[in-house]
């Protein structure tokens, strides 16, 4: 399967309030027709927190919002896992944003999901990576990074 690296130019922030929408409405629309979850990884402790849709995407049981990284990795296609781990590494070490489209186990088949993440400063710590993951229906693995200048 082909892999494409994208160069991202900084996008202008799209303010939903400029068209009369609230942030809640934006999230409601994003989640309306697909699984769409939020997550964070504390870089000092490794604590990986996720919302229920992330658990549903990975066909995992949600107990207290703490994602089991070992189980999480078992659900990712073995060809895609090293690239996803590189995304996490580059994001945290170079304070970048990234996106990646990759395959997740669904029964005997694989489905595509997209993860978008970014490094976030957290005072007194090494920071954290925060992001979203949602079902994706294109059939191309891809990864992209920004230069970190916000």
What are the language-model segments listed below?
Residues 12-22, 81-83:
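Short, positively charged
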Residues 42, 107-109, 139:
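Short, charged helix-to-loop "capping" segments that act as catalytic/coupling loops
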């Amino acid at each position: 399967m082909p892999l494409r690296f994208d160069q991202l130019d900084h996008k202008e922030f799209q303010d939903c309030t400029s068209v009369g929408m609230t942030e809640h409405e934006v999230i409601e629309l994003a989640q309306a027709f697909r699984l769409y979850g939020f997550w964070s990884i504390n870089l000092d402790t490794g604590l990986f927190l996720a919302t229920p849709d992330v658990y549903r995407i990975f066909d995992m049981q949600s107990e207290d919002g703490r994602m089991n990284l070992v189980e999480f990795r078992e659900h990712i296609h073995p060809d895609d896992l090293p690239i996803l781990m590189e995304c996490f590494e580059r994001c945290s070490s170079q304070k970048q944003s990234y996106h990646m489209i990759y395959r997740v186990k669904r029964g005997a088949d694989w489905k595509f999901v997209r993860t978008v993440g970014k490094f976030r400063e957290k005072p007194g710590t090494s920071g954290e990576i925060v992001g979203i993951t949602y079902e994706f229906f294109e059939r191309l693995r891809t990864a992209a990074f920004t230069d970190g200048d916000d």
